[in-house]
Amino acid sequence: MSLVRLLPAWLHAVADYAVGLSLIVVAVAAGGSTKAVAVGVVVGAVVLIVSMLTKYPLGVAKVLPFTVHSAGDYLAAALLVVSPFVLGFHNTATGLTAFYIVAGVAVLAVSLITNYQYNDKREWSPSRAVTA
């Protein structure tokens, strides 16, 4: 479900991989408690795996419908925002807490403006612009 369909699938895919990688890298680089690092590594890894399985421009296996993928986006956003408070590291890992909240809000924002009605025959992508 999106509010407006501004963002094409290929750009959403780029954002997915960027978020997944940045969650892992920032969590490991920043350090902190096991719980604080685990949130970034686990959510980041799941984002990457779901992205690779999704039927969209940068999907690898392309077995998961993009509309189903959207549910994972909303779940990831919620987990990123609430996990510092639920797992109790918001007072000790303030940098990671802020990063997770910002990342969660960004994931939510991207999800709300994505066109989840992806059709690979009609979708513009950078590679099609080169060959056209």
Regions found by a protein language model. Give the residues of each.
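A low-complexity, Ser/Thr/Gly/Pro-enriched, surface-exposed linker/loop concept
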Residues: 2, 39-69, 109, 113-122
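Membrane-helix boundary elements
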Residues: 16-37
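Intrinsic N-terminal pre-sequences and regulatory tails
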Residues: 1-10, 117-132
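Alpha-helical membrane-associated segments of multi-pass integral membrane proteins
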Residues: 95-115
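Membrane-helix boundary connector in multi-pass membrane proteins
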Residues: 82-99
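Short, amphipathic, aromatic/basic-enriched membrane-interface segments that mark the entry/exit
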Residues: 3-15, 64-71
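Hydrophobic alpha-helical membrane segments
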Residues: 69-84
